[in-house]
């Protein structure tokens, strides 16, 4: 399978069904069109839910989203076809709607909503593990972005870009990997764990078998950052200004060979990706032997 995204990769390999569950309206951020273009068969959104379950402009709460998804996933599992499902939660995003049972005067609103979101995930996993399909399913948890904690430590705060990535399921041995990674690595890692053949047509890595990255880079609007274990390089494409920091203290430093190496690393990956997209090299086309 030629794959740049898990929905297309898994679907082409074994005729799987791909689903996306979101709390809000499907047109938000053009998600409906984007996800369907990228291989999702079914989209579940605010349009599918009872109006009385909508709690704010971000739609329904996390616990309802998980409860809604469970019977849908069960139905697909009972059909005998494997599925790939993504659930996008939103409760940990202001404005916070905190259920009464999680109101705790000793905690800040941010802490209360995190406790609620964590409980929703925990309850979902407990219920999913009781399902027949839950015993042979890989669960992946990742944040789309972090949250600014305290004062900004640099132009692209570490706390806003350092997010959890957890793979969970039967047969997965407990382990903590201290290595650089990015969301682009999730699809290759899942396909590797499932032993689904694929042609790599993006710059992601299989975190369990490929050589670890020497560094990582990330962007926000017109700002680019790259870092390794000792140095952080930041570039503002709008102003042309460069910033260098020594790690782990994130202390301002002078440009060095290490920062120049990080700059080349980030720019080469960005330019390569742009070239691949512009020349149709990331298009998914199943191999002739795909079922």
Q: Language-model features: where?
A:
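Solvent-exposed soluble domains appended to multi-pass membrane proteins
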Residues: 1-291
């Amino acid at each position: 399978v030629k794959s740049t995204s898990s929905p297309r990769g898994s679907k082409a390999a074994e005729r799987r069904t791909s689903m996306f569950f979101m709390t809000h309206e499907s047109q938000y951020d053009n998600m409906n069109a984007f996800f369907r273009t990228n291989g999702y068969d079914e989209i579940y959104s605010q349009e599918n839910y009872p109006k009385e379950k909508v709690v704010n402009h971000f739609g329904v709460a996390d616990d309802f989203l998980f409860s809604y998804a469970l019977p849908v996933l069960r139905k697909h599992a009972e059909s005998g076809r494997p599925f790939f499902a993504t659930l996008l939660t939103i409760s940990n995003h202001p404005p916070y709607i905190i259920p009464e049972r999680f109101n705790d005067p000793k905690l800040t609103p941010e802490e209360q909503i995190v406790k609620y979101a964590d409980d929703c995930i925990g309850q979902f996993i407990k219920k999913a593990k009781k399902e027949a399909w839950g015993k042979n399913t890989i669960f992946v948890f990742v944040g789309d972005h972090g949250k600014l904690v305290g004062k900004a430590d640099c132009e692209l705060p570490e706390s806003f870009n350092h997010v959890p990535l957890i793979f969970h399921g039967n047969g997965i041995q407990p382990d903590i990997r201290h290595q650089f990674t990015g969301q682009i690595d999730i699809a290759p890692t899942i396909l590797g764990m499932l032993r689904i053949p694929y042609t790599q047509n993006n710059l992601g890595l299989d975190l369990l078998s490929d050589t670890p990255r020497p560094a990582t880079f990330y962007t926000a609007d017109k700002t680019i950052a790259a870092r390794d274990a000792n140095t952080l390089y930041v570039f503002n494409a709008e102003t042309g200004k460069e910033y260098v920091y020594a790690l782990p203290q994130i202390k301002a430093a002078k440009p060095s060979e290490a920062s120049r190496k990080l700059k080349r690393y980030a720019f080469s990956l960005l330019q390569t990706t742009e070239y691949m997209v512009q020349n149709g090299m990331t298009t998914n086309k199943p191999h002739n032997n795909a079922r």
